[in-house]
Amino acid sequence: MQVTVLSGAGISAESGVPTFRDAETGLWAQVDPYEISSTDGWQRNPEKVWAWYLWRHYMMARVAPNEAHRTVAAWEDHLDVRVVTQNIDDLHERAGSTNVYHLHGSLFEFRCDACGSAFEGNLPEMPEPVETIDPPVCPCSGLIRPSVVWFGEPLPDAAWNRSVLAVSSADVVIVVGTSSIVYPAAGLPEAALAAGKPVIEVNPERTPLSDSATVSLRETASEALPTLLQRLPELLNRSA
């Protein structure tokens, strides 16, 4: 059986990864997300944007995968599992998942903004957050940026195509910790439902997907996932 997991910020929040909606450290609590997550913001103030993402890189590196990440990884022992994530952390990989597609890029990969070359150098140390820091410079003289998707940028083709295939070939799709409002990612469970596939939503809050999902559970990821596969036949029978 192939299980495709669509994961969002909620699964990593349980590990202590803050989202844009959380109160962050005092330095960044009032920052406009567009100011630090757009090409416009990068072009206006690359030093500020680089400082914010470098701090998040180190902050994410300090947190550990939680029970939900470990459960999804353990499913690979007896299932074909694909993980499509909107998260830019590496918690799925550190938990042991091997087929992970990052729709919004990764904060653990960096590239030149000018020539696109991958950055293999050392990152500057950052023991505490600062407002600005100079980005590294590529040999072509371009600035090094995080390999994440900013507002207005397209999703990476390879990750998107693999994600579409992962959903179209799945026997069941599990949507975990995502608000289901950010497109085109939010269209993936809709496509699965249109194809007649069971879609299980796991989210402590209702989302736009809740009414149409085959099963919608008001539970956190770490509460629901460890027993979800055992409960699956009963849940699907109840929804039929």
Curated annotation (Swiss-Prot):
Q: Which intervals hold domain Deacetylase sirtuin-type?
A: 1-235
**Subcellular localization:** Cytoplasm
After gene disruption, what is the outcome?
Not essential for growth in the absence of DNA damage. Increased sensitivity to ionizing radiation in log, stationary and late stationary phase. Decreased efficiency of NHEJ on blunt, 5' overhang and 3' overhanging DSB, fidelity the same as for wild-type NHEJ.
User: Binding residues for Zn(2+), per the UniProt record?
Assistant: C112, C115, C138, C140
- Entry superkingdom: Bacteria
Q: Where does NAD(+) bind?
A: 8-28, 86-89, 177-179, 203-205, 221
Per the UniProt entry, the Enzyme Commission number(s) are 2.3.1.286
Active site feature: H104 (proton acceptor)
Q: Does the keyword DNA repair apply?
A: yes
Catalytic activity reads: N(6)-succinyl-L-lysyl-[protein] + NAD(+) + H2O = 2''-O-succinyl-ADP-D-ribose + nicotinamide + L-lysyl-[protein]; N(6)-acetyl-L-lysyl-[protein] + NAD(+) + H2O = 2''-O-acetyl-ADP-D-ribose + nicotinamide + L-lysyl-[protein]
Q: Which PROSITE patterns match?
A: SIRTUIN
How many and how are cofactors bound here? Binds 1 zinc ion per subunit.
What GO terms fall under cellular component here? cytoplasm
InterPro entries from the xrefs?
DHS-like_NAD/FAD-binding_dom (IPR029035), NAD-dep_sirtuin_deacylases (IPR050134), Sirtuin (IPR003000), Sirtuin_cat_small_dom_sf (IPR026591), Sirtuin_class_III (IPR027546), Ssirtuin_cat_dom (IPR026590)
Which Gene3D superfamilies does the UniProt entry name for this protein? SIR2/SIRT2 'Small Domain (3.30.1600.10), TPP-binding domain (3.40.50.1220)
Keywords in alphabetical order: Cytoplasm, DNA damage, DNA repair, Metal-binding, NAD, Transferase, Zinc
Q: Which SUPFAM superfamilies match?
A: DHS-like NAD/FAD-binding domain
Q: How does it assemble?
A: Interacts with both Ku and LigD; may form a trimeric complex during NHEJ.
Q: Which PANTHER family match?
A: NAD-DEPENDENT PROTEIN DEACYLASE, NAD-DEPENDENT PROTEIN DEACYLASE SIRTUIN-5, MITOCHONDRIAL-RELATED
Job of this protein: NAD-dependent lysine deacetylase and desuccinylase that specifically removes acetyl and succinyl groups on target proteins. Modulates the activities of several proteins which are inactive in their acylated form. Involved in non-homologous end joining (NHEJ) repair of blunt, 5' overhang and 3' overhang DNA double strand breaks (DSB). Overexpression increases the efficiency of NHEJ of the above DSBs 2-fold with no effect on repair fidelity.
Please give the record's comment on domains: 2 residues (Tyr-53 and Arg-56) present in a large hydrophobic pocket are probably involved in substrate specificity. They are important for desuccinylation activity, but dispensable for deacetylation activity.
Give the protein name, as stated in the record.
NAD-dependent protein deacylase Sir2
Q: Which organism is it from?
A: Mycolicibacterium smegmatis (strain ATCC 700084 / mc(2)155)
Organism placement in taxonomy: Bacteria, Bacillati, Actinomycetota, Actinomycetes, Mycobacteriales
Q: Which gene produces this protein?
A: sir2
